[in-house]
Amino acid sequence: MEVSRPYVNTVDVIDFGIDKRFFRLPVSGILAQEGITPNGPQIAIINALEDPRHRFVTACVSRRVGKSFIAYTLGFLKLLEPNVKVLVVAPNYSLANIGWSQIRGLIKKYGLQTERENAKDKEIELANGSLFKLASAAQADSAVGRSYDFIIFDEAAISDVGGDAFRVQLRPTLDKPNSKALFISTPRGGNWFKEFYAYGFDDTLPNWVSIHGTYRDNPRADLNDIEEARRTVSKNYFRQEYEADFSVFEGQIFDTFNAIDHVKDLKGMRHFFKDDEAFETLLGIDVGYRDPTAVLTIKYHYDTDTYYVLEEYQQAEKTTAQHAAYIQHCIDRYKVDRIFVDSAAAQFRQDLAYEHEIASAPAKKSVLDGLACLQALFQQGKIIVDASCSSLIHALQNYKWDFQEGEEKLSREKPRHDANSHLCDALRYGIYSISRGK
């Protein structure tokens, strides 16, 4: 287990005193009443929330540790205080119903009187004036208009829009003194949840704290069940769900890419790339308007059969003339031999040719074959990305297969169209259009 702030106790639940702690009622009381003996990650979550130095707690914790269980228990404890508002944000309807049932079960178990219960809007108002609300990250607007004391993001990383939902809609609702937010999840690669997790290690953000735990930190975990899962699920899924590993995730397209092997500082190799006879220089272009237009400059080395990505460009809502100016810059700087553009962007190619005298060819379009080609090249170490191409690196790490609407089932028929698509498409257009087996 790892905690970003070393002073956070992971062995014993600490009482910070009624004047300083977050929960007015002692956490030890609800733990004893419920017969809960918390494990290390659960203790860390409790103490991190109780500590007045923290407002935002990010817990990247694997399955079989009880992160959601302890979070909902703490949310219920907060509701026992008068005139408190607790919001739980869930990524989908299924998880929302689980949380709703857990809170309702605790309210019923302790015989709390309710003034209002709205199953449709997922709201419960208690007789003490406290309110529990459950919302989805995709519809965070439904939760604004109130000031919350405690916001819990359950399985936060599952929703791609959770980060924006918090930054734009929900963080302004934490305007009460000592209001806090808890983000709990298994990871999903390098999305916004990883960014929030990194905040806890930033010394300039002392009110953030991060916790990492796996099934090994739960002494009550069934190791036989864990080993059966290891044998029956994919390697990436096991590392994601049971190791809480940010570096891989189920559905990751370029799981053969890793920054250690495939990202290099190529600035010191300029003399190497100046040998025009040894290289072919390519541009791969994915065209968009509201979506960004992405351009990658790629050097293909004949002798080693290796592709070097030297420069990236990604701009939205620009004119063809503005994109053409950048493309001409690349042509002049890198002596570009061939330009491959999304075959669906015929008008863009025509405008480049007739208005800017830039010739291009339609890229090979087969998506699955092109992705398989790139996967194999990464596996063979045949694609190297310059360290300055930070957006491409992020895209490669987070590009994933699409999910069917409302399901966890992956579709491997097509990639998900999101912010990671554009540079990955440009890479595919540039490389697959000249690759082996053409």
Swiss-Prot record:
UniProt cross-references to InterPro entries, sorted A to Z: P-loop_NTPase (IPR027417), Terminase_6C (IPR035421), Terminase_large_su_gp17-like (IPR044267), Viral_DNA_packaging_terminase (IPR052380)
Keyword entries, A-Z: ATP-binding, Endonuclease, Hydrolase, Magnesium, Metal-binding, Nuclease, Nucleotide-binding, Viral genome packaging, Viral release from host cell
Motif (Walker B motif): 150-155
Effect on the protein of changing D342N: Almost complete loss of endonuclease activity
Cofactor note: ATPase activity requires 1 Mg(2+) ion per subunit. Nuclease activity probably requires 2 Mg(2+) ions per subunit.
Any GO molecular function: nuclease activity
Keyword set includes ATP-binding: yes
Residue numbers annotated as active site: E155
SUPFAM superfamilies membership: P-loop containing nucleoside triphosphate hydrolases
Positions of Mg(2+) 1 binding: D286, D418
Bilayer-crossing regions: none
Function of the molecule: The terminase large subunit acts as an ATP driven molecular motor necessary for viral DNA translocation into empty capsids and as an endonuclease that cuts the viral genome to initiate and to end a packaging reaction The terminase lies at a unique vertex of the procapsid and is composed of two subunits, a small terminase subunit involved in viral DNA recognition (packaging sequence), and a large terminase subunit possessing endonucleolytic and ATPase activities. Both terminase subunits heterooligomerize and are docked on the portal protein to form the packaging machine.
Protein's name in the database: Terminase, large subunit
Native source organism of the sequence: Escherichia phage T5
Taxon lineage: Viruses, Duplodnaviria, Heunggongvirae, Uroviricota, Caudoviricetes
